[in-house]
Amino acid sequence: MIKYNGSSCLELNDLWQALHSSFNSAQFRSIDKLILNECDSFSPMTWLKFSEEEFSCTIINCKDSSAPSPDKMSWGHLKHIIKDKSCLKNFVCIANACFDLGHWPNHFKESKTIIIPKPNKFSYDSLKSFRPIVLLNTLGKLIEKVIGERLQFQVISNNFTHQSQLGGLKFKSTTDTDIALTHFIRTGWVKNLLTSTLAFDIAQFFPSLNHHLLSLILDKAGFGPQVARFFLNYLINRKTSYYWNNFSLHSFDINVGMGQSSALSPILSALYLSLFFHIFEKHIKNLDLKISTLSFVDNGLLITQSKLFHLSNDRLFSSYNVVLTLLSKFGLQVEHSKTKVFHFSRVYSTFNPPP
């Protein structure tokens, strides 16, 4: 029996309401858009028309075995269709028209949300033990992939993303995160310093991205009014239908967040956090806290080095409070139960750091 807010979901309608409220809990969360004034706007970038080559190169990497979309079209179908150059040209025209008009068709805004259980959970009476998988229409997904590729390369060219961000971006991976952390630890040991870290997890990160703030961040990043206008329309009036086993319900409005199945989720979420890390860095410098950061999508790591445990703990505690304050201004929250502190020492005897 699924429980939500202490009450059992006895009727299907109770379940649907619980699902929607749980996976869209941030829709009424406040933001502080004035926080963006702490960073300067980046130089405007030119947005060129899409090309047939961009579409052809993108669809090659799409796996035919992907889950079927709401429009029943597979990647294999689409690959066959674009062999006809006139069809490919029409797809490119649709994508360019979307940016010219600042419009994303309602057909592409409709999705299916499949609820699946997370593996190896002790109990499945809570919605936290389940994961939403969002299925989008295939042609819309293709255009999103092309847009995502374009955004990735443009933010790399203007260095908008923060150097600590190692997830959701091209040419960066979990391996880079491991290498960077190992480098921190070993260079600290060479200097006879203890390396201490605080790991935190942003709760329901993708469903919590505020659409209005995201459009302002895109403008700050230098994408210009054409791109900002497109995303203002892209993000609104989205709808999803929930599916649980053999049951379904049509449909709910979605006014916050990004579906993790969207090709735009990695880059848009990275852009969303870029300004957070730039602003966090300024606050840390003003407080004279010797803190470094690493980030992989929705997981953050605060790093400090010293010879004294209490000094490291004080720095981590102070910087963690800065993280919580700034994230709240971005409409985000930390899942405190997952926050952990780790100390990396080269002491070979019994190692028992203070709490």
Show where each model-derived region lies:
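Surface-exposed loop/turn segments and immediately adjacent short secondary-structure elements
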Residues: 1-126, 141-142, 161
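Mobile genetic element proteins and their domesticated derivatives, centered on retroelements
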Residues: 19, 55, 69, 91, ...
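Conserved catalytic palm subdomain of right-hand nucleotidyl-transferase polymerases, strongest
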Residues: 64-74, 113, 125-135, 175-216
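Catalytic palm active-site di-aspartate
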Residues: 69, 110-113, 131, 165-166, ...
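Conserved pre-motif C helix in the palm subdomain of viral-like polymerases
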Residues: 125-159, 176-180, 203-206, 254-285
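Conserved polymerase palm-domain catalytic core
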Residues: 202-297, 305-313
